[in-house]
Amino acid sequence: MRTKQDFINALSKMKRNIYYDGQLIDRTDELQSDCINVMGTTYDEAAKPENEVLMTATSHLTGQKINRFTHIHQNTTDLHRKQDMTRMLCQKVGGCIQRCMGIDGTNAIYNVSFEADKVKPGETNYHENFKKWLTRFQKEDMIAACAQTDTKGDRMLRPAEQPDPSAYVRIKERTKDGIIVEGCKLHISEASVSDEVLVIPTRALRKEDKDYAVAFAVPADYDGMKQVVTIHNYRQREHFKRGFTPGLTDSYLIFDNCFVPWERVFLAGEHLYGGVLALLFALFHRHSYSGCKPAIGDVILGTAALAAECNNVHKESHVREKLAELIMTIELGYAAGYTASDLGKPEVYIPGMGFVPFGPGSYIPNSIYCNVGRCLSGEAVWREAEILCDIAGGVVATFPHEKDFVNPDVGPALLKYTKRNPKMSAEDQAQFWRYLGDSMCSATGGIANVGNYHGGGSPIMEQIAITTQYDIESRKKLVKFIAGMSGGDREALAPKVKK
């Protein structure tokens, strides 16, 4: 396994294909340093002996010790540890750990490539291609961005109906050596600090959309792909540094007649599996959210409690009620993810068929509980922000800049007049309000809230998944029996025992 410095050294050797604010930049540009430090945490923590069980695994391909972020889940224990690893790391960086796209993308492709090879037995080699790619990915402890979201063009038209065929990433041409693709993937988190980019479909596809059923991997500095990155950093401080300063990036990935050799292609035209891959990545990513969002909730809870303490209202009953509400949201989201892990099996939900065996045997979290947990947590994002705003008051929006506090003309007076709790130092109170201003009243803080709401799938997507997969009809039959109506069935929800 590599170190954080190995990771940075690898970034420094990559070709320049990243545009920021109109200019080409290096991956190790200072603007990306906060994001790199977040990603680097996944290497620093994996090297600690106390984190070995949580952060490392044994590769089922090579038998070697690997970083868990490169692992394919082999049992429910792996699913539990992935959730707990994600929560632990997100706590340490105060937000998104950024590396989950890779583990979620690899687990989805691992399963779908196996099934897609059954469409034309002997004619495709998707699964073996992916296993070869994955072996190197694990051995070199690499980071992968997962590029799913297409530009989509006219939202009322399907991919093959678009006036611009590149509104969704598509196979433009097939050759004996590979495929040529064009299109753009957007909102791609941390592609600017990744070694590889995994590309997968974004939606269900029909037969006429088969050219859009494509999955492949390319190096993040690959010829034929350009990145346009947006970098999200908090305001830099000169005098009153944070304990840890996270940063985020997201990229538009432009594929311009990009050639991909067959050995890096994991799906090419099997339209039914394009939709399955889109949904399966979303499922794994929502499972990651059940570790990520509780950790962010832990940070929000601590922030709300400290805001109340700084304001010296921490003993008031309305504060206790709000803290209890935060705790319930945190732990319900985690509990749903825990249950999804515990009920994980090598199976997926297929409409009209229910849960069926899927893939070569790796474990997939239960989709109902993944979606329930993600939806509950996602819908709570703005309520959590409201609670912080309510407890903090207006000071968070109007707090003076740090250099005012070191100006001898006004600094001492500012410390005096911003102190609220006589039992807490004025310096600590000022430092807290600076931190909360970063979280609540900055562009990056706003972006984080939007990401927490939409990341892994907007709540409406979870609601669709829940209502299509949940057995509502059996509940109706049970109630018909209880009510004395025709068509009732007292045993509608009784456990089905296999003989």
Where are these regions (language model features)?
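A structural signal for well-ordered alpha-helices, especially hydrophobic packing surfaces
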Residues: 39, 43-46, 308, 330, ...
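Glycine-rich flavin
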Residues: 57-196, 202-216, 221, 226
